[in-house]
Swiss-Prot record:
Coiled coil: none annotated. Signal peptide: none annotated. It comes from the Bacteria. The keyword Cytoplasm does not apply. The KaiABC complex composition changes during the circadian cycle to control KaiC phosphorylation. Complexes KaiC(6), KaiA(2-4):KaiC(6), KaiB(6):KaiC(6) and KaiC(6):KaiB(6):KaiA(12) are among the most important forms, many form cooperatively. Undergoes a major conformational rearrangment; in the free state forms homotetramers as a dimer of dimers. When bound to the CI domain of KaiC switches to a monomeric thioredoxin-fold (KaiB(fs)). KaiB(fs) binds CikA, leading it to dephosphorylate phospho-RpaA. SUPFAM superfamilies: Thioredoxin-like. It comes from Synechococcus sp. (strain RCC307). The gene is kaiB. Belongs to the KaiB family. This is Circadian clock oscillator protein KaiB. Key component of the KaiABC oscillator complex, which constitutes the main circadian regulator in cyanobacteria. Complex composition changes during the circadian cycle to control KaiC phosphorylation. KaiA stimulates KaiC autophosphorylation, while KaiB sequesters KaiA, leading to KaiC autodephosphorylation. Phospho-Ser-431 KaiC accumulation triggers binding of KaiB to form the KaiB(6):KaiC(6) complex, leading to changes in output regulators CikA and SasA. KaiB switches to a thioredoxin-like fold (KaiB(fs)) when bound to KaiC. GO terms for biological process: circadian rhythm. The lineage of its organism: Bacteria, Bacillati, Cyanobacteriota, Cyanophyceae, Synechococcales.
Length: 110
């Protein structure tokens, strides 16, 4: 099992809409159960800080951006699908590759 990585995440929302609040609640649940406190989450309201959304080229909300560890990943839209979020954060793949029964093909050359 590889050592736990620290995740740095940004969640872009548009105000206190039901969709924004649902995204935040779902994400916090995932983070508390899967990341065990080894993360930093910054919530950015694009209505209050539009310059940050513009700098990061955010076109839709909610958008979850994983900044660290690389590579940078973005999940745009509904965050209620737990598996989709975990795959988007590369967490599900890492768990599968850490499993001794999992086979990962690294080289396709003959």
């Amino acid at each position: 099992m590889s050592p736990r990585k620290t995740y740095i995440l940004k969640l872009y929302v548009a105000g206190n809409t039901p969709n924004s609040m649902r995204a935040l609640k779902t994400l916090r649940n995932i983070l508390e159960t899967e990341f065990l406190g080894v993360y930093a989450l910054k919530v950015i309201d694009v209505l209050k800080q539009p310059q940050l959304a513009e700098e990061d080229k955010i076109l839709a909300t909610p958008t979850l951006a994983k900044i660290l560890p690389p590579p940078v990943r973005r999940i745009i839209g509904d965050l209620s699908d737990r598996e989709r979020v975990l795959i988007g954060l590369d967490l599900l793949y890492e768990e599968l590759s850490d499993d001794s029964n999992a086979q990962v093909l690294d080289d396709f050359s003959e």
